[in-house]
Amino acid sequence: MKIFLYNCFILILLPAMAVRIVFKSLKDKDYRKYFSHRLGIYKDIKSLNKPIWFHAVSLGEVISSKRIVSDLLKNNEVILTVSTPTGLREAKKIYGDNLTVVYSPWDLIFFVAKFFKKFNPVALIIFETEIWPSMIYVSSKNNIPIILSNARLSQTSFRSYMRFKFFVLDTLNKFSLILAQSDQHLDRFRRMGVPINKIKKVGSVKFDIKIKR
């Protein structure tokens, strides 16, 4: 029921989200380029062989996650999703043809399900604190590991999440593993109600992962 209400809310916002893209494209035409990706339509992208889905929202996260993504690429197919043109351009600049980079679908179950149908990812790694309920819900329904890497939870975000704990905790508990940046961030996730056995302090963006295919 909670995820249904959330999707109804996002559906109401959809026209405004589309208008926002139009206005932003006046300054940066790449906002409207590949617009179909935001709807979960990737006809211009070739299918992959059970890739790891790595989500880094924007330019800063793309740069910070370079070490992890490069390590993953050594032994895995990876698809990187971003939300901004600057992130898209930087990722293409860094990885070239070695990595598939696309816009992430808007956070509606229908759009995310279309992404899964196209790419069939075997794991989802979200960088830092991009907590998208539909993305995580559909991943959970597909029984794949969901990892929050380099996770941080500021005091401001913590207070906001606590106000909606009844909903946020449902999403957080779907993570298989949360790799926190520090003891402070780890403690905030714990106080949110995430089981302590799902949270680890790593202190670095580098980690090893093995995926069963």
What residue ranges belong to the model's regions?
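Membrane-interacting alpha-helical segments
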Residues: 2-9, 13-23
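Absolute protein N-terminus
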Residues: 1-2, 164
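Active-site and donor-binding regions of nucleotide-sugar-utilizing enzymes
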Residues: 18-211
